[in-house]
Design a protein with these regions (language model features):
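Active-site phosphate/pyrophosphate-binding segments
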Residues: 92, 146-210
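N-terminal export/assembly segments and adjacent metallocofactor-ligating motifs
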Residues: 1-172
Length: 210
């Protein structure tokens, strides 16, 4: 339970309803600007709640920086923001080092969507395909259908090589034959599932994100 300071000691607040009231009352009593410090928030519902407090200054700070993604989205015309991803709608998922089931952005939300695409039933007769490229073992990589390993320094080259296979760049040289073959296979699957495929990158390099 949350703790509430009463005089010189801390006491438990037994319900979150009471805690919400304590926070709301404290914000009203503060009068002026109140600072809310959080990690990056991508949830629309959470943003909606925060927007209800006009005197609230929302500061977002991440122990792990996502500035590369933010700047890439801004440069691409999508605004200086972090998007949300609907993994349940993707038939093909390609991750370039994004541990979306473990530590990347909103893993609880992503795991829920990801699991929907991995279950076969009458409404969903085929399971989504998950390819993963990474420089070290991760929770997400261990769940992939096909996992390709590489040196961390090769992340950018792999992103460019994949883009080249899709017709958008000059292909760099990939020495590892298995890795090069994997890139070609992934690109072919992305093309075959155009409109129902997703590529995410865990890199904090703006150019890789673009």
């Amino acid at each position: 339970f949350p703790l509430h300071k009463v005089k010189d000691k801390f006491e438990e607040v037994p319900t979150f309803e009471q805690f919400d009231k304590l926070v709301g009352d404290a914000m009203k009593a503060a009068g002026g600007s109140v600072v809310l410090l959080t990690s990056t928030i991508v949830s629309p519902s959470t943003k909606e709640i925060i927007a209800k407090f006009p005197n609230l200054k929302h500061v977002q700070y991440d122990a792990v920086s996502y500035s590369g993604m933010i700047l890439a989205n801004e440069a691409s015309g999508f605004g200086k923001r972090i998007p949300s991803y609907n993994f349940s709608a993707a038939k093909v998922i390609v991750s370039l080092g994004a541990d979306f089931l473990g530590t990347w952005l909103s893993p609880v939300e992503f795991a829920k969507g990801y699991s929907k695409g991995r279950k076969i039933d009458e409404k969903n007769p085929s399971m989504s395909k998950h390819y993963h490229f990474e420089g070290h073992l991760s929770m997400t990589g261990s769940n992939a259908d096909e996992r390709f390993t590489h040196r961390p320094s090769e992340t950018g080259a792999i992103a460019v090589a994949l883009l080249a296979e899709l017709g958008g760049a000059v292909a760099p040289s990939i020495a590892d034959a298995k890795l090069a073959a994997g890139i070609k296979k992934v690109a072919a699957d992305l093309k075959a599932n155009n409109g129902a495929a997703m590529v995410v990158s865990g890199s904090n390099d703006k150019n890789v994100q673009i």
